[in-house]
Amino acid sequence: MRFLLLLPLLLATALPAAEPLNLSAALRQPGLSVVITGGTPLVVTVTNQSATPVTIAQPAGLICAGGDSRVVTLRALEVNVAAHAAAEATVPAAFLRDGEPTKPWLPTAETEPRLAPLLGYLASHNDMPRLTAQLLVRCVVTDIDFAAWQRSLGVEPPAEPTPEHIVAAIDALGVLRELAPEKTFALATDPRLKLLALRNPVARRKAMQLYGIDLPEAPLPPELGTLLHTKPGDNCPICRQRALMQPREDGL
């Protein structure tokens, strides 16, 4: 009798853990509901109505479709869902193709081999800003230039790119030089980006290195704003000029 009581416990410990499911398999699994929403990032919501815990594991590089639009996941995803429970996870993603997406997204069997080196790089660089990572995907897949990328972000002339966009573009250019030094990307030959980056105090030093401009031995010239007064009585060029223009008490 004691053996019969212990038998369920022994069988439970002997049974191997359920294999993780990828998102496509999870969508077909009875008792599971998987909904993929969001954009960049994607939001994966899993509802487990079964009596068995479930693990969903998806490597980076999954391409999801929403109408004519496509997004690709930039990092691996793992979701552990207890029995009769729900869980939600977000995964960084980037658009492969512009367009008005339909929701929810659906995983596809499509692949993009050109992204393999970039995905490997991102796996070891967890601090990569989202904007930079998304631009890198567009550069690798479509060789997008700076102006086209700005249009995809809704920045149309005469609007100027934000400093954040300029820094992201220069950071992306640095990564591209590291991943594919033999290739010339459209981003690297964009004269407007070069001019904007050299004028940007945050991106200037890195831009000079990327564009092959010798760095001066002395510190870079200070910005004009640092030369102006910040409080009354500061000896700035404007204050000195104003003092020279004031009439003297002796009338001279």
Where are these predicted regions, by residue range?
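Terminal connector regions
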Residues: 94-149, 154
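Asparagine-centered strand-capping/turn motif at beta-strand->loop junctions
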Residues: 36, 40, 44-56
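Acidic (Asp/Glu-rich), glycine- and aromatic
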Residues: 31, 52-71
